């Protein structure tokens, strides 16, 4: 997708700066991001049976994703601290990989979008799964982290 718009994080001199969103109206905004982790069949089966050595890896990954979304502004240098009004994290088996697919939906009402919070949540949730399972499967692969949907603000709705 190409755009004629300028990069908003560069000022007129080409220097990096944090965008001033102070005069933008507060609107409802939503973003959905997704990613996956591929693993050995044996590791996948351990998760499905609830027999992983470190306990409930799915619950820990959900909490990690939520924490990460709330701290996005501390991790991504030019992101604004925003107030999340809601968030859903869903982790589903993906038999064909074999592996897991992690989806995150974030919501806010404010002057800036919530895409980065959803993307960071997916990334950290998947990294947490890797961390908790690496002892049994160090060859796992994280991939396909992508924005699926965003809405709100001046650019309206975008879908992959």
Curated annotation (Swiss-Prot):
Region (Disordered), start-end ranges: 1-20
EC annotation from Swiss-Prot or TrEMBL: 4.6.1.17
Pathway assigned in UniProt: Cofactor biosynthesis; molybdopterin biosynthesis
Keyword rRNA-binding on entry: no
Superkingdom of source: Bacteria
Organism in which the protein naturally occurs: Synechococcus sp. (strain CC9902)
Residues binding substrate: 78-80, 116-117
Protein role: Catalyzes the conversion of (8S)-3',8-cyclo-7,8-dihydroguanosine 5'-triphosphate to cyclic pyranopterin monophosphate (cPMP).
Keywords for this protein: Lyase, Molybdenum cofactor biosynthesis
Name of the protein this chain belongs to: Cyclic pyranopterin monophosphate synthase
Uppermost EC category: lyase
Gene name linked to the record: moaC
Pfam families per UniProt: MoaC
Similarity annotation: Belongs to the MoaC family.
